[in-house]
């Protein structure tokens, strides 16, 4: 039986990977591919006051809360970030994220720039943020239209919002232009691989290097 390689056994903190983009730029598609192909990642499950849809499963899609319970979590400091969208509240529970990161497990956040800013403020040393850009606004419109999920009015609103969202690109650690989905996905995976190797995230390196220096090869 082969023993694990030294690099695989060195203790590390997890990565909090934040993916943001305007609607239609490919953020959610890349997030799904990452979860399917990289089993070190877990998707952060948000809490929400929105009513559960028939197809949704508690604890898988969301943790569904009453308004009172949500406010208690918010006021008690139990949320890393939260926002109100279309009259419903959404937030990221603090406890599961902190336990995962301390245990060396990586967490994926598919959130907008406002949520990313709140996470960056709460856990700045653990965040790796990537902003996904469309190659052109014309292509963004084409993607939104091809989805056939929204009315022309909603598509127009999404395009207007996209301008403001794209203006936040400088706040992110990395920017990936999604002109080819496979290339964009490969870029995100390369970012993740490099960030996992940062020595600041690998407290176990201290003991490994000390042991390495203490060796006396025959």
From Swiss-Prot:
One of its GO terms (cellular component) is cytosol. It catalyses: GMP + ATP = GDP + ADP. It is an enzyme of class 2 (transferase). It comes from the Bacteria. It is found in: Cytoplasm. Disulfide bonds: none annotated. InterPro entries: GK/Ca_channel_bsu, Guanylate_kin-like_dom, Guanylate_kinase, Guanylate_kinase_CS, P-loop_NTPase. One of its GO terms (molecular function) is ATP binding. SUPFAM superfamilies: P-loop containing nucleoside triphosphate hydrolases. Keywords: ATP-binding, Cytoplasm, Kinase, Nucleotide-binding, Transferase. The keyword Membrane does not apply. Its EC number is 2.7.4.8. CDD domains: GMPK. ATP binds at residues 21-28. The keyword Hydrolase does not apply. Residues 14-193 form the Guanylate kinase-like domain. NCBIfam families: guanyl_kin. Belongs to the guanylate kinase family. Essential for recycling GMP and indirectly, cGMP. This is Guanylate kinase. It comes from Chelativorans sp. (strain BNC1). The lineage of its organism: Bacteria, Pseudomonadati, Pseudomonadota, Alphaproteobacteria, Hyphomicrobiales.
């Amino acid at each position: 039986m082969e023993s694990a390689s030294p690099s695989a056994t060195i203790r590390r903190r997890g990565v909090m990977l934040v993916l943001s983009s305007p609607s239609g730029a490919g953020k959610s598609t890349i997030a799904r591919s990452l979860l399917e192909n990289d089993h070190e990642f877990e998707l952060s499950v948000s809490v929400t006051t929105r009513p559960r849809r028939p197809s949704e499963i508690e604890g898988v899609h969301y943790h569904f809360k009453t308004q009172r319970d949500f406010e208690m979590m918010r006021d008690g400091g139990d949320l890393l970030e939260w926002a109100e969208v279309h009259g419903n509240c959404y937030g990221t529970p603090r406890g599961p994220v902190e336990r995962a990161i301390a245990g060396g497990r990586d967490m994926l956040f598919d959130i907008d720039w406002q949520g990313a800013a709140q996470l960056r403020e709460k856990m700045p040393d653990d965040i790796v943020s990537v902003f996904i850009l469309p190659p052109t606004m014309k292509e963004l419109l084409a993607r939104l239209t091809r989805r056939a999920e929204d009315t022309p009015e909603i598509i127009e609103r999404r395009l207007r919002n996209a301008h403001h969202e794209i203006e936040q690109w400088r706040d992110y650690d990395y920017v990936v232009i999604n002109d080819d989905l496979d290339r964009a996905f490969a870029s995100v995976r390369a970012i993740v691989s490099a960030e996992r190797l940062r020595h600041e995230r690998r407290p176990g390196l201290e003991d490994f290097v000390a042991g390495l220096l203490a060796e006396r090869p025959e």
